[in-house]
Amino acid sequence: MHFDPNKFTVKAQEALQAASMLASSKQNQQIEPEHLLSVMLGDHDNIACQIARKLETPVDTLLSVVDREIDRIPKVTGASATGQYISSDLGKVFDTALKEAEQLKDEYISSEHLFIAMSEAGVKVSKLLKDAGIDRNAILKVLTSFRGSQRVTSQNAEESYQSLKKYSRNLNDLVIKGKLDPVIGRDDEIRRVLQILSRRTKNNPVLIGEPGVGKTAIVEGIAQRIVGGDVPENLKSKQIAALDIAALVAGTKFRGEFEERLKALVKEVQASDGEVILFIDELHLLVGAGSAEGSMDAANILKPALARGELRCIGATTLDEYRKHIEKDAALERRFQTVIVDQPSVEDTVSILRGLKEKYEIHHGVRIKDAALVAAAELSNRYIADRFLPDKAIDLIDEACSRLRLEIDSEPEELDRINRELRRLEIEREALKRELEATGSV
């Protein structure tokens, strides 16, 4: 096969470039499959490395074996060491990769095609891979968990593999790992959200409330209930994925890249047959996210999937942002069912603080009295007018614990102030003494 860079995906081109640089650094005139395999296994983001790890292959051991093979390749120095070329073995790998791409109905040669080709082309690295338990069937079996039913139809196709994993956080996993704070109260709102999620159509709740009233906490509470099995039968197997819009937009330099990522993510959610519920915090960011002049924004990509009921979604935004962005877009607004989240009463805030007390005690290493929790709820409600419960009460407790810990670990503030004043006066006294000595000597 004549080497044509335009037939390769961006990631595959990067791997080939890295292989060329590795060959140069080792003073090898020919670029061999060993160079390519070494750079692919050494890059944790490369799908070849991820497939090998999924197959439970000791990647570091395999990498050291490949590097030993590279050291055996003849070195060329002096006047004859001009120019680099692709070896006949690597040419065979390219031919096999092209056949693999055609067989998988892909339009470009990507990293996984090269990886399969290296195990199949009958070159030296094929034996190394087979000895490590990596062959075509094993790779293809694992590949579906990365690609699903996706095909390589663009040069950036590898960017869209496992989109859900890259651009969202699985709240169910965080609950199992104990990374989320317990959610106390909010039973009415949680029940209303579960009721909307159980509907056949228009099953997309949007939580509307002021900043700090606990909209995200409600969704975390639902994830905790799903993990605990305390939900209707039709929601017991569901996973909640919190979308990271910043990660989705980051690095999209060229027009169409953002849309491609989002479409891949939506396709992955659709392929789960309703098992994944997407949580979009700051829902208003979707209106206009990724849009440049003449291109679609994220909301327009989501609308068809929401309308057909193929995408189940929970949104969260403030009342002002909802009115400014979402209410104006009637087509988007009618896809969602609103759930108003008011700030809790002082009594409910005290209950929430009691539930969080243990987490803060462990973090700060101090004991929190119940009277302090009641005082935090009452005083924050009375004196902090521009913030909302329970957020401002939680902040008060956190701030007080932090201050107490600081005083325990270091000198008390009063003593520290007196010591600093003493040091300042001592420096002043020394300066005056030197001045007096100087005038005395004159």
Curated annotation (Swiss-Prot):
Region called Repeat 2, residue ranges: 86-149
Region of interest: Repeat 1: 8-73
Domain Clp R positions: 5-149
SUPFAM superfamilies: Double Clp-N motif, P-loop containing nucleoside triphosphate hydrolases
BP terms from Gene Ontology: cellular response to heat
UniProt-annotated binding residues for ATP: G209, E210, P211, G212, V213, G214, K215, T216
Residue numbers spanned by region NBD1: 162-343
Gene Ontology cellular-component annotations: cytoplasm
Chain segments carrying region Linker: 344-442
Coiled-coil regions listed in the entry: 394-442
Single annotated GO MF: ATP hydrolysis activity
Cell location: Cytoplasm
InterPro entries: AAA+_ATPase, ATPase_AAA_core, Clp_N_dom_sf, Clp_R_dom, ClpA/B_CS1, ClpA/ClpB_AAA_lid, ClpA_ClpB, P-loop_NTPase
Pfam families for this protein: AAA, AAA_lid_9, Clp_N
The record's note on its domains: The Clp repeat (R) domain probably functions as a substrate-discriminating domain, recruiting aggregated proteins to the ClpB hexamer and/or stabilizing bound proteins. The NBD2 domain is responsible for oligomerization, whereas the NBD1 domain stabilizes the hexamer probably in an ATP-dependent manner. The movement of the coiled-coil domain is essential for ClpB ability to rescue proteins from an aggregated state, probably by pulling apart large aggregated proteins, which are bound between the coiled-coils motifs of adjacent ClpB subunits in the functional hexamer.
Function: Part of a stress-induced multi-chaperone system, it is involved in the recovery of the cell from heat-induced damage, in cooperation with DnaK, DnaJ and GrpE. Acts before DnaK, in the processing of protein aggregates. Protein binding stimulates the ATPase activity; ATP hydrolysis unfolds the denatured protein aggregates, which probably helps expose new hydrophobic binding sites on the surface of ClpB-bound aggregates, contributing to the solubilization and refolding of denatured protein aggregates by DnaK.
Oligomer and partners: Homohexamer. The oligomerization is ATP-dependent.
Protein name in the entry: Probable chaperone protein ClpB 2
Organism expressing this protein natively: Chlorobaculum tepidum (strain ATCC 49652 / DSM 12025 / NBRC 103806 / TLS) (Chlorobium tepidum)
Organism classification: Bacteria, Pseudomonadati, Chlorobiota, Chlorobiia, Chlorobiales
